[in-house]
């Protein structure tokens, strides 16, 4: 039995390992990969490998893997990548797995500067990538520095601006906050919708020459063939939509495109190597087929996939709505719990204050009772003193009477008796005055005692009112695509041709009516302009690249990808071919 061959296939987010037989075809390996990752939109993808000469090449599906010039390694290395790009991601990419693989591949191309992206758009795209990774921004979880380990901006952008990591994070975070409530898969789609408007998105560039020998770039993409000047990959100068082309062929390094317009001459260019022409032919056929397929009614399979995707999205939206509802309920319950806790604390504080007041009143009552007792004792003493004085007065009266009687009886010693009488009279007057003074003191003490008694009664009444007040109520309970494949390595097979059918298609050139995603959203467009102005203040003009200069010129002239597309397709096919020959 033949020995199995180990194969490693790297997708954008996983590594897959298989053991294949020596007679396994490219299609059998490809089918095994798409089945493993659960992909149905297979027409966009292919398996890429590095050949023995170091060139990156697409695996041919109709040939055995072992018969192709795959670099001899163990295991054999392949990359599963998008080979063809859609015209409109929101209309064509159906499955989430397809959207995710495109997102990761496009993001990598932007970060590696294979697709030029202006700084302000790079920040916007970064915010969608962050939303896709982290979900909604939450200041409790996403603390400063939460993006420190993420590669989010092209190195060119970082080097061109005098901004710290923290300042870049702040700008990305501002937009991340705005995406609140956006599903992760919707963030991926928003990223792709912005990215597909970038001039270099989905374009395969090939170095070519016209008959004059002028070095140019040929761009092959989902919409057709475009010609670029050698120093400008951003702005094509001439364009040919797929609907204008009826035949493509090559003979050695010469490539011939026959237009549908019989009056127009052939469109001829030259590639540096035969293998380049083989690759151009394969890409032209695949892109043309997809271009025509898009302009015909969907197949049953695609209709079913779209229906299933709509159902899955609807289900996710329902689940999210349910989660949001539960979250709101939980937040309400938390707020209610906090309110009850707050009220409980307020009641406890009120109770503490009442207790303090009660204790204070109790102390005052005790003090007043003590004072009342003291006053009563003083009153008693004053009374006793008054009684004593009264007794003395009576005794004095009696003595006076006796002396008076004695005086009456004894007139003998009248002067002596008169003196004694005067003495007693004076003494009586003093005692009368002392008695009067003590009676006044007793009266005063009596008034003070009555006032103290009234204060005591009043305090007792207040205490009774405080003690009889109902206790505070308890807190309420908490409610909780086909392509004609040619061997790029077979230098003997030096010519090939393919007819491109344009039958039965609807609205051939609808792409010329498109506008960019940011033009559809005035708010985002204004934010991008504001950020562009802000970043311009921090830009190091000495580090501008050729693409930066070209992009700035396009913006100043009011050009974008679709306006340029309309412009470069103006005039008939013959005029544009003549223009190409004159370059």
Curated annotation (Swiss-Prot):
Sequence segments annotated as region (Disordered): 310-336, 374-407, 458-526
Cross-referenced SUPFAM superfamilies: Moesin tail domain, PH domain-like, Second domain of FERM, Ubiquitin-like
GO cellular component: adherens junction; apical part of cell; cleavage furrow; cytoplasm; cytoskeleton; filopodium; microvillus; plasma membrane
One Gene Ontology MF term: actin binding
Biased composition (Basic and acidic residues): 374-400, 483-492, 506-525
Segments forming domain FERM: 5-295
Compositional bias annotation for Pro residues: 469-480
Phosphoprotein among keywords: yes
Highest taxon of source: Eukaryota
PROSITE patterns: FERM_1 (PS00660), FERM_2 (PS00661), FERM_3 (PS50057)
Binding residues for a 1,2-diacyl-sn-glycero-3-phospho-(1D-myo-inositol): 60-63, 278
Keyword Protease belongs to the record: no
Subcellular location: Cell membrane; Cytoplasm, Cytoskeleton; Cleavage furrow; Cell projection, Microvillus
Pfam family, one: ERM_C
GO biological-process terms attached to the record: actin filament capping; positive regulation of early endosome to late endosome transport; positive regulation of protein localization to early endosome; regulation of cell shape; regulation of organelle assembly
Modification note: Phosphorylated by tyrosine-protein kinases. Phosphorylation by ROCK2 suppresses the head-to-tail association of the N-terminal and C-terminal halves resulting in an opened conformation which is capable of actin and membrane-binding.
Entry keyword set: Actin capping, Actin-binding, Cell membrane, Cell projection, Cytoplasm, Cytoskeleton, Membrane, Phosphoprotein
Membrane topology value: Peripheral membrane protein
Regulation of activity: A head-to-tail association, of the N-terminal and C-terminal halves results in a closed conformation (inactive form) which is incapable of actin or membrane-binding.
Notes concerning its domains: The N-terminal domain interacts with the C-terminal domain of LAYN. An interdomain interaction between its N-terminal and C-terminal domains inhibits its ability to bind LAYN. In the presence of acidic phospholipids, the interdomain interaction is inhibited and this enhances binding to LAYN.
Assembly mode: Interacts with CPNE1 (via VWFA domain) and CPNE4 (via VWFA domain). Binds NHERF1. Interacts with NHERF1, NHERF2, LAYN, MME/NEP and ICAM2. Interacts (via FERM domain) with SPN/CD43 cytoplasmic tail. Interacts with CD44. Interacts with CLIC5; may work together in a complex which also includes EZR and MYO6 to stabilize linkages between the plasma membrane and subjacent actin cytoskeleton at the base of stereocilia.
Record's protein name: Radixin
Source organism per UniProt: Sus scrofa
């Amino acid at each position: 039995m033949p020995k199995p061959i180990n194969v490693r296939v790297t997708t954008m987010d996983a590594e897959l390992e298989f053991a294949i037989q020596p007679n396994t075809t490219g299609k059998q390996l490809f089918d095994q990969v798409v089945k493993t990752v659960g992909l149905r939109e297979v027409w966009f993808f292919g398996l890429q490998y590095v050949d023995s000469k170091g060139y990156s090449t697409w695996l041919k599906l109709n040939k055995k893997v072992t018969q192709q010039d795959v670099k001899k390694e163990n295991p054999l290395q392949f990359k599963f990548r998008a080979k063809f790009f859609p015209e409109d991601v929101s209309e064509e990419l159906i499955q989430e797995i397809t959207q995710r693989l495109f997102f990761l591949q496009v993001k990598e191309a932007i970060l590696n500067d294979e697709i030029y992206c202006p700084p302000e758009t790079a920040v916007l795209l970064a915010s969608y990538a962050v939303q896709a990774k982290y979900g909604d921004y939450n200041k409790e979880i996403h603390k400063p520095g939460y993006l420190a380990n993420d590669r989010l901006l092209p190195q060119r952008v970082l080097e061109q601006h005098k901004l710290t990591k923290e300042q870049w994070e702040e700008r990305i975070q501002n937009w991340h906050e705005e995406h609140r409530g956006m599903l992760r898969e919707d963030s991926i789609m928003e990223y792709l919708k912005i990215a597909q408007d970038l001039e270099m998105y989905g374009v395969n560039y090939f170095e070519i020459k016209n008959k004059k020998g002028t070095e140019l770039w040929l761009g092959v993409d989902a919409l057709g063939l475009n010609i670029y000047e050698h120093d400008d990959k951003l702005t094509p100068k001439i364009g040919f939509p797929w609907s204008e082309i009826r035949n493509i062929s090559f003979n050695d390094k010469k490539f011939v495109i026959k237009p549908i317009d019989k009056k127009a001459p052939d469109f001829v260019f030259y590639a540096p190597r035969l293998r380049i022409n083989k690759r151009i032919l394969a890409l032209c056929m695949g892109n043309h087929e997809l271009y025509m397929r898009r302009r015909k009614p969907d197949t049953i399979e695609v209709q079913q996939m779209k229906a299933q995707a709509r159902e899955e999205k609807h289900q996710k939206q329902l689940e999210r709505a349910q989660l949001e509802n539960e979250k709101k309920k939980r937040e309400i319950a938390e707020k209610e719990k906090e309110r009850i806790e707050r009220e409980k604390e307020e009641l406890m504080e009120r109770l503490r204050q009442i207790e303090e007041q009660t204790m204070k009143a109790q102390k005052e009552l005790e003090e007043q009772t003590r004072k009342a007792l003291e006053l009563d004792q003083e009153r008693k003493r004053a009374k006793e003193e008054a009684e004593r004085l009264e007794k003395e007065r009576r005794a004095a009266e009696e003595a006076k009477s006796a002396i008076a009687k004695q005086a009456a009886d004894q007139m003998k010693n009248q002067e002596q008796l008169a003196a004694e009488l005067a003495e007693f009279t004076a003494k009586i007057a003093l005692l009368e005055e002392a008695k009067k003074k003590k009676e006044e003191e007793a009266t005063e003490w009596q008034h003070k005692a009555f006032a103290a008694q009234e204060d005591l009664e009043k305090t007792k009444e207040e205490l009774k009112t405080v003690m009889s007040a109902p206790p505070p109520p308890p807190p309420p309970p908490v409610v909780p695509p086909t392509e004609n494949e040619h061997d790029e390595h077979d230098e003997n097979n030096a010519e090939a041709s393919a007819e491109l059918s344009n039958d039965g298609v609807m609205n051939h050139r609808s792409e010329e009516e498109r506008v960019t995603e940011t033009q559809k959203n005035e708010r985002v467009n204004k934010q991008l302009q504001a950020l562009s102005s802000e970043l311009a203040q921090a830009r190091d003009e000495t580090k501008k690249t050729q693409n930066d200069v070209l992009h700035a010129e396009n913006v100043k002239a009011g050009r974008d990808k679709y306006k340029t597309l309309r412009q470069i397709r103006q005039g008939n096919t013959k005029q544009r071919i003549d223009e190409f020959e004159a370059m």
